[in-house]
Regions:
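Short helix-loop-beta connector
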Residues: 81-88, 110
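Short glycine/serine- and small hydrophobic-enriched flexible loop segments
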Residues: 75-79
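Active-site-adjacent beta-strand anchor residues
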Residues: 59, 91, 117
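N-terminal ligand-binding/catalytic initiation module
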Residues: 1-66, 72-74
Length: 128
């Protein structure tokens, strides 16, 4: 399910389930927040027991979202390289996802050089 606002920002419901659990990530994706210098995404995760319906947790979902996205990037990078060597990476955009991506990529690449670019170059300098 997706709700699109008048400004073009959106809310998304991302459900999942297993034999014993049902869960949902509810995420607000507000690209317009970039101009306000506030985070562009905000997420929460709810987990329920499928046998009783009881909620088991309600947790902040931003860290998990960042870690999952960065882990996916690292696994894809490792697969694409298939044993080839590289020691340079570049980030186009230096926001909330940059640090988790660097941390996960360092697990699969022997990084020697990092290039940074952002529309707001002060963000690239601050990250460096």
């Amino acid at each position: 399910m997706r709700i699109i606002t008048e400004s073009g920002d959106d809310f998304r419901a991302m459900p999942a389930n297993t034999k014993d659990y049902a869960g949902i990530k509810w995420i607000a994706d507000y690209g317009s927040n970039f101009k306000k210098n506030i985070p562009t995404t905000d997420a929460v995760i709810i987990l329920n027991n499928k046998h009783t319906g009881k909620h088991l947790c309600l947790i902040e979902g931003n860290f998990i979202t960042q870690a999952r996205t960065a882990a996916t990037t690292a696994l894809a990078t490792k697969s694409i390289l298939m044993g080839d060597e590289t020691n340079r990476i570049a980030f186009i955009g230096c926001g909330a996802q940059t640090m988790p991506h660097l941390q996960f990529l360092l697990e699969v690449i022997d990084v020697k050089e990092i290039s940074l670019y952002d529309k707001d170059m002060s963000k690239a300098y601050n990250f460096a």
